[in-house]
Amino acid sequence: MKAHQSLHVVAGFVRFPMSKTGQSRCYSILKDISIPASKQKFVPSSGTYPKGFLAAGAHAGVKESNTQFPDVALICSETPCSAAAVFTTNKFQAAPVQVSKQVLEAREGADITGVVINSGCANAVTGKGGLEDAKSMSAKVDECNGTPSTSSKRPSTLVMSTGVIGQRLPIEKILNTIPVAHSSLSSTHKAWLTAARAICTTDTFPKLLSRTFTLPSSPNHTYRIAGMTKGAGMIHPNMATLLGILCTDVPISPAALKLLLSHAVSRSFNCISIDGDTSTNDTVALLANGAAGGQTITTPSSPNYAAMQTVLTSFAQSLAQLVVRDGEGATKFVTVRVLNSPSQADARAIASTIARSPLVKTALYGKDANWGRILCAIGYTQGIQAGTVVPERTSVSFKPVDGSEELKLLVNGEPEIVDEERAARILQDEDLEIVVDLGGGERGEEGMGGEEGIYWFCDFSHEYVTINGDYRT
């Protein structure tokens, strides 16, 4: 049974000023938080947030160039939570990743009270000192919550950081700011949006969503989920690619929460790509405090499990897609869908290869229907089964956003005569879908299959190089 959902994403922007040109990109959001006109529609002007969760953002000045904007965020629950997280697979895991893992393992995903996040410095590859800094951030929040961690009492706050790698945190600034943020914790939309703003780096807009929904066992009972994320570059999954904090007031056990999050991440944050790089810091955490009451979800056989999985996966996909829409220098949001593969793994591998191809991405930026680059990426995909890609069965097309007929580029290995004028019109739109049909037929046919894989990605522009060339300046 599917859950009923209501998405609170309202066009408009209430506090962050728009740039004079309406189109400028913030190369460093700490210097300029102007929101391009085309991005304002993605910033919510209202929201409905989970019961018992509070948010705040405050200014610490982690980067010396940041003299006024929030760069420390807190998300706290008024009651202890179940928590789960998925972390980067990068071998150089940042100090906050290591500390958050320790917190979750020590408490077995139970009795977590919140998350503290800083932007402006990744606290990655910073040695033992960096680990102590991350631990002190967790301890300071616990102290503010009135539950200080001691030698016999384990920390209960997760830690996240984002920014430049290889630099120590200005830890005293952050520790002095945490009580300031804690004193302003609130359940208001303003507080949540300020927290979402505080975790931004090269992002052009804060990424915040909230939804209300019902579950089968309590059809007249309203539940809530909210989440924020950051990320515009160094985005390619495995997990993960960014920072994400999701909160819900549904009662869920730690074991069930871990399963729910893993499934959702594999179909959302692990299906996006900006530039093919996987960060040292990236983390997606899910907190559930049960404040809305009702039956606790404990196992996949629980009455509400399947419906909750649907809600969470859909919500995570919406958050992940916001990251792609804010890709550094991006002008396009592209969906690549691979059909009729012998396995979902092969379909996703092919979609991933297309999504991270610089030649595909630059062609799309140039509005060039150069489908040969797509075909090339399909052909060099690594790690797929023999026989997955058969040139004589492969078809490629562009699917316009207006719902009109697909523009066929290649059909069963034979090139089509392409209407270049129509192709140019399709590529003028911000959104585009690329459909790759491997011609595997319906599931069950011998040697064939009907599995599908999907990825979301953006194009590469001149601006991507400028942003990343200037990142530390």
UniProtKB/Swiss-Prot annotation:
Metabolic or biological pathway:
Amino-acid biosynthesis; L-arginine biosynthesis; L-ornithine and N-acetyl-L-glutamate from L-glutamate and N(2)-acetyl-L-ornithine (cyclic): step 1/1; Amino-acid biosynthesis; L-arginine biosynthesis; N(2)-acetyl-L-ornithine from L-glutamate: step 1/4
- Indicate where this protein resides in the cell: Mitochondrion matrix
Which regions form coiled coils? none
Q: Which UniProt keywords apply?
A: Acyltransferase, Amino-acid biosynthesis, Arginine biosynthesis, Autocatalytic cleavage, Mitochondrion, Multifunctional enzyme, Transferase
Q: Looking at the keywords, is Transferase present? A: yes
Catalytic site residues? T241 (nucleophile)
Q: Give the highest taxon in the source lineage.
A: Eukaryota
Residue sites binding substrate per the record: T201, K230, T241, E328, N468, T473
EC class, as a word, reads transferase
Q: Which CDD domains match?
A: OAT
Cleavage (site feature) positions: A240, T241
Which Gene Ontology molecular function entries are recorded, alphabetically?
glutamate N-acetyltransferase activity; L-glutamate N-acetyltransferase activity
* Biological process annotations from GO: L-arginine biosynthetic process; ornithine biosynthetic process
Q: By its UniProt entry, which InterPro entries does this protein fall under?
A: Arg_biosynth_ArgJ, ArgJ-like_dom_sf, ArgJ_beta_C
| UniProt modification remark | The alpha and beta chains are autoproteolytically processed from a single precursor protein within the mitochondrion.
Specify whether Lyase is a keyword of the entry: no
| Assembly and binders | Heterodimer of an alpha and a beta chain.
Q: Which family does it belong to?
A: Belongs to the ArgJ family.
Which PANTHER family does this UniProt record tie to the protein? Answer: ARGININE BIOSYNTHESIS BIFUNCTIONAL PROTEIN ARGJ, ARGININE BIOSYNTHESIS BIFUNCTIONAL PROTEIN ARGJ, MITOCHONDRIAL
Q: Protein name, please?
A: Arginine biosynthesis bifunctional protein ArgJ, mitochondrial
